[in-house]
């Protein structure tokens, strides 16, 4: 089992697409920051907010190209940090998290690390089984060929949040995985980054794991069929696409906000509850933006409670 300590580097790709992405970043710093971890924030383009500061947080400005793949490729090339840490967590700002129940005593990173072992190449929050008829699967097969296991599905850990060990990252660097020079479309980025990453590791004899338990039973080195009948094109991250229901933020820990599987109001209410169990760490400074996010979550939570009471009182008046 991987231990959470100062040999872990958390690499967060931050892009200010809209207010939701800003809130995703602020939520992450508030609830994912731990003094015993190291943080490298890769900023794609510019940052308009006051950036939280701490001795174990480093900011790196990268060219806004090829999404998080491009940012990671640039920072890995420029900083050459791969031998300085034992394990790496990659997170991008399209997701909000971590979300943890108030009774959770475990460091958020341990939820990922507990699934890691010598025969596992990558651990993420979710695994997709993209069908072979999907346009991006066809793009992948055209460029990289079609392995026996990929005739019906193309399994891959989603790249919004995942863990790699030092040995795995070093092997990827050595094999040229991060040597990206041309501009890629969104589909090409999914093909060359998200899909290719997992497929390289599977070809090396390493398996995949994620936080969703149903997806940890198969051996993806040989799996050739869909395991979730309600998945949308192999993706369990949509409404009612996780074995007939919607994944709860506490299960996935990170939620892709653009899909609206959980409303911004609901996520804010969860964040408000979490703030009592996980207060802002005293080691952080320049936290005005985080405090603003905290106040917005509090306002949403308290106003929602007030509205519910008023609605109940309204109907009670007619039923009395």
Positions of PLM-derived features:
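ER/Golgi luminal nucleotide-sugar-dependent glycosyltransferases, focusing on the catalytic module
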Residues: 1-320
